[in-house]
Amino acid sequence: NYDFKRNTEKTYLLVGNSCPWCHRTLLVYKLKKLSRQVKVIFLEADINSGQWVFNEKFKGCKTLNQFYKKGSQNNVFRSTLPLLFNFQNDQINILSSESSQIVGLMDSIKSESSQKTLEVNNCDQDLLKTIQIDINDGVYKCGFARNQSSYEKASKNLFKALSKIEKKLDKNLGNWICGEELTYADIYLFPTLIRWELIYRNLFKCTEKEISDFKNIIKWRL
């Protein structure tokens, strides 16, 4: 329910370089040219501690966990990225820590840039749900499956969803998943597929088919 038009406080977006869910928020940030309204701060993953850390202390905090504790006195939040927030009366005001919601919030901001922005349009919610559950989450379900049955189910759903996208692209007249207009479907799918060969194929065992077998998806990804 946050109204960006009525609130003039500087909005901040915390993201991690390696996080695909952060990547989708950064895509909207760039496409909408929101650098005047939203300040992006990148955090690094500390392998030793398993935490996200600031390159320089931010508001007295070195880690994301410390920042969450400082800003969620009345609410319980998991220390995850991305994170959209501002300050009210010098207090941290968390707007959202859910990437899909952040994408929608940022897309609602009117850019102050003089340059032309690219609009992100809505798409079929069932398609978006398929991308989110079976592809974005699906690669992790494959990689972290606790048994063979769970892995096979996740892999089957993953490649079934990719086949659905492949067929949809084959019927399209435009360059995007839903035709001639960029939609949330493109924003959601790209961060996963751009990481496919480097991460998901081998490390997460997403090997039922090669991504190169999906000719239309490869063309779309370019």
Regions found by a protein language model. Name each.
Residues 15-20, 44, 68, 85-90, ...:
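Short, flexible loop/turn elements at secondary-structure junctions
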Residues 10-12, 37-40, 82-83, 91-94, ...:
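Beta-sheet entry/capping signal
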Residues 76-80, 94-98, 104-111, 115-222:
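GST-like fold's C-terminal all-alpha helical module
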Residues 53, 57-87:
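Structural micro-motif
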Residues 8-9, 51, 56, 148, ...:
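Domain-scale activation on soluble regions of proteins
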